[in-house]
Amino acid sequence: MRKSVVVALLVAMVATSCRVLLVPDPPGPRSHDGFLPSWYWEARQSSYLDYASTQFSAGSPTNLIANAEHSRRTGAPFNTAGITMADYANSFSRMDNFVDTADFDLTYIMNLWYGYRDLLPADVRAGIESHMRSFKYWFTDPQPTGTIDQRYYWSENHRLLFHADEYLAGQAFPNDVFSSDGNTGAWHKARAHDFIDRWLTEKTKYGFTEWHSDVYYQKTFDALLTVVEWVDDPALAQRASMLLDLLLFDMALNVQKGNFGATHGRSYMKDKSKATDEDVFNLNKLLFDDTSLPYDNTGDPGASLMARAQKYHVPAVILRVAQSKHTTVDQEHMGVALDAGAPVDHTQTGIDGYSFTDPQNVEFWWERGAQTAWQTVPLTLDTLDSTGLWESDFYKPFKAIADITGGDRVAAQNLAQALEPMLGFALLTAVDTYTYRSDSVMLSTAQAYRPGKFGEQAHISQATLDENAIVFVTHPKNEPQSGTQWPDDDGYWTGSGSLPRAAQHGALSMSLYAPVFASPGPPLTAFRYLDYTHAYFPQERFDEVTQSGSWTFGRKGDGYVALYSWRPTHWRTYTDPAIFTHGLTQPFDLVADGGADNVWLTQVGDAQKFGNFAAFRAAVLANPVNVAPRPVAGGLPGGFDTSYTSPTEGTVAFGTTGSLMVKGVETPLNTGKRFDNPWAVANVGAQQITIADTAGNLKLDFANVTRTASATRRHHRHGPKDGRPGGGNR
């Protein structure tokens, strides 16, 4: 009788949720209350603290945090005398001179001060406190005469970092008058409270603007954890914990052997060519323990802050997601749909209540890189006029728009719309991401994201087999650059001169390149692109690489990848020692000459599905790729119609325009879901999100600001008992 009732309940659950809960594989540490048990989590924290404390870097606040926490836990000596004002002279100078990213410095120094100020020498402590009261916390605050503010306040991560910094400074010194603007600390705390509230509300509704970023998720993580650990408002701290859960869930869904190798809203070649270059690597290792590679930064911000965290507790289900060996698909929708290429329509006044003209919404639109969208150009110009930001390095180029149009806002809107494929280079609009992952390989794509347009930092698609074996394609803006590292502005591998129209279904991704603008001359040479596309396919990081016709195949362990190019390819030879190659000595740059338009296909597989590598290659080659170029239109490539019968997906057809067809059935690129995967299905803007498997769940109720986790009584890997009661609300 009991068995039949249980079966009936399970059937009802499946019918209601339209999904079957996964049995965790591996099972993970036994959880009694839905959160990671303290014995396990403290061991993970210690794994980083033990490593970080092998070095003492007095000028690194995050390394000092790790050393101080290690000392607190183990009784090891802490070298207070080794810290001097000279160690912080550069950070203080950056703050005093309005240098960009000084908010990063202040966040880490603020965490050091809040957690371990009693260990700091009196003069260093006083210097920190003085800068907490003198820092300029927002772009609308007074700027000293004769100085230029070079800070960027408006990206997703910067916004919350500035607001958290301001809140904590005001919280620490509520009655003091801040020299930056003459307001009290209490005033600053109240303003920051409202800013943080707005930011949290936006993320709850829209998800993360800088989607899956292997660079900036670390900064957003740092800001959220800072709010959780130190802000004295319980509701703000709880909401930040809940968004931190979603950020880590996002990372867990898109990590493969320590590599956050998904499509990225913002990334750089210096961060994405291998896992240990990613800003999130040490944090991922601490959290998920899914790579054998060692920690590699004794002052890593994310890992240092997480290794000393006391108030934030990691839900056990998130670890199980990251470590899952199941073959799964995750589809996500994030961001705000702003079409800056649509015809100018002055009856459009805003989106979802966010006005295009209200000065209170500057940070909302600028976070999304919409400074040059025709909808917000008047607001941008008005803001630059009123704040004096024209002189900053970032906004100087925008002066050309104002000069060309003589300050006429309508003319500026028309110009912005006409040049949108170029001027929208930094736009972060709504995105639909698709990630296929097995135990041996992962493939991830941003579906049909701004096709044909210039992309400054967007990373559209990638196959990831392990920490180092990855494959991706870009349309280069410039030839390879010399130097001792990949430059931030390396347009050869970072971003794309034009973004492809890409679509993924299962283990197959198609990327169709067809620029919608001609490579320009002066004064728009910053938007030039080269007449070819290419792939990053580092041969020495694979166990095998072989080619057959238009296909290039790679194997790493039991993971397989096949890359197709419609245009003929060749391996670029690097003979100039001045060109940075990150130590690669074997070919890694697969170039497809002949035009900026091309069709690239990526098919992945593994030994579990295909058996050996030869069988995978034979299956991929069994059917031809059919590519039909469309006629040239207006001197620009017309694009393509492409079809291929995949060994895993059947016949898939996709074009430069039109629907994705799978086995003759139209397949939407947008599911309308914030999350759609085996652990969570939630609509965009959902106020309740449940992340679950058969071992337990996490329930987030943003409407009521509750965060509850639970564990089912199953057979898990055992460790010492936690002593915590079952069920948790933290």
Language-model regions, residue ranges each:
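Positively charged n-region of N-terminal signal peptides that target proteins for export
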Residues: 1-4
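Hydrophobic helical h-region of N-terminal Sec-dependent signal peptides
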Residues: 6-15
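Ser/Thr/Asn(+Pro)-rich, low-complexity disordered segments
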Residues: 13, 25-161, 174, 183-196, ...
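Contiguous, well-ordered alpha-helical segments that form the cores/surfaces of helical PPI scaffolds
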Residues: 69, 107-111, 160-172, 218-230
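Charged/polar, low-hydrophobicity segments characteristic of intrinsically disordered regions
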Residues: 99-111, 139-154, 198-213, 246-274
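Internal, well-ordered domain-core segments that constitute the primary functional module
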Residues: 186-254
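Extended amphipathic alpha-helical segments with heptad-repeat/coiled-coil character used for oligomerization
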Residues: 225, 234-313
